Swiss-Prot record:
InterPro entries: GAF-like_dom_sf, HrcA, HrcA_C, WH-like_DNA-bd_sf, WH_DNA-bd_sf, WHTH_transcript_rep_HrcA_IDD. One of its GO terms (biological process) is negative regulation of DNA-templated transcription. It comes from the Bacteria. The lineage of its organism: Bacteria, Pseudomonadati, Pseudomonadota, Alphaproteobacteria, Hyphomicrobiales. GO terms for molecular function: DNA binding. Coiled coil: none annotated. Pfam families: HrcA (PF01628). This is Heat-inducible transcription repressor HrcA.
Length: 356
């Protein structure tokens, strides 16, 4: 997990201040409620009077780590305080073998014989269910290796060209046929293409067919040769014309504890923003900036500043270690960070392995 360096004045807090601050944050993460000096005095490992605790809380408030939501209330951590807690106190453990087994079984089952979109949707749904937040998967445009191409005649002068990738994606295009093309020539053209494009990306397949132009002339008649050339040409620009897409599951989880209309509006804006192209680019950029899991709390990220949400995100990579997408959890700032970080990290690694 990538961690920024906390402010020196915060790092120099004495042990008593750290204990009180840690208990305030842990109480907030568990119950979402302010905690006062009397409750803290019962929770602290050393005996301190409520008056002493109030003095320490005043110092912590002055540092911007905690605040009082009401005049007579206890204290809650600020976003800066949560960041300090994550950087200085949080201990991220490993997932148990059982947790790893459950995640791996669910992801592998969703990918078996299914499309890439299906597997990523299931990953988003699973993260949502395990975290009680909203699961998010960003699928960037990738060039998956091709599996096969097929031509199906629709009319005497029209055919459906079907391009299937090894990740299960299927693309269809209608092409115009030269006059006189027979069904056997359609099969001959597709067989020739499949012999040379399997396992290559679309760009690589086009380069390979250009290199084999002379061999194509010798192996095929003119009509079949025309089909071979047209069969790949119709996907000109397809390497870059499919946009990245975002998959969000578990939106209802974010609404469970929301009662104020203003908070509902903030969440609505968040989901609207997440559907924009700019958000996709920004999220992928965030994932690419660090080697592992990244945590963004509230206003640390412009996309989530209005809703006061947190984002825990990790990239997943292809066989060449290029970032091809990201996945994570969006939720309230009182997420269980220590539990979710290893969950997101392991899921990202697993998805990356299955896509290779």
């Amino acid at each position: 997990m990538t961690k920024p360096v906390a402010d020196q004045s915060l790092q120099s807090l004495d042990a008593r201040s750290r204990d009180i601050f840690r208990l305030i944050v842990e109480s907030y993460l568990q119950r979402g409620e302010p905690v006062g000096s009397r409750n803290l005095s019962r929770l602290l490992p050393t005996q301190l009077s409520p008056a002493t605790i109030r003095n320490v809380m005043s110092d912590l408030e002055h540092l911007g780590l905690i605040y009082a939501p009401h005049v007579s209330a206890g204290r809650l951590p600020t976003q800066q305080g949560l960041r300090f807690f994550v950087d200085a106190f949080m201990e991220v453990g490993d997932l148990s073998e059982e947790e790893r087994r459950v995640i791996e079984a669910q992801i592998k089952a969703s990918g078996r014989g299914q499309s890439l979109d299906h597997m990523l949707t299931e990953a988003s749904q699973m993260l949502s269910g395990l975290s009680r937040g909203a699961g998010l998967v960003l699928a960037a445009k990738t060039e998956a290796p091709l599996k096969h191409i097929e031509f199906i005649q629709l009319e005497p002068r029209k055919a459906l060209a079907i391009l299937v990738s090894q990740n299960g994606d299927v693309e269809n295009r209608v092409i115009e046929l030269p006059a006189g093309v027979t069904a056997s020539q359609l099969v001959e053209a597709s067989n020739f293409l499949n012999a040379h494009i399997r396992g290559r990306t679309l760009a690589e397949a086009k380069s390979e067919m250009a290199r084999l132009k002379e061999e194509t002339r010798e192996a095929l008649d003119s009509l079949s040769q025309s089909l071979v050339e047209q069969g790949l040409a119709i996907w000109a620009g397809a390497e870059s014309d499919t946009p990245a897409r975002i998959i969000i599951r578990g939106r209802a989880n974010l609404l469970e504890n929301v009662t104020a209309q203003a908070d509902l509006e903030l969440l609505r804006h968040l989901f609207d923003d997440l559907e924009t192209k700019e958000a996709l680019i920004q999220l992928l950029g965030l994932a690419e900036e660090g080697p592992g899991v990244r945590i963004f709390i509230g206003s640390e990220n412009k996309l989530f500043s209005l809703s006061g949400s947190s984002l825990i995100v990790a990239p997943y990579r292809d066989q060449d270690s290029r970032v091809i997408g990201a996945l994570g959890i969006i939720g309230p700032t009182r997420l269980n960070y220590a539990r979710i970080v290893p969950m997101v990290d392991y899921t990202a690694q697993l998805v990356g392995r299955l896509l290779r």
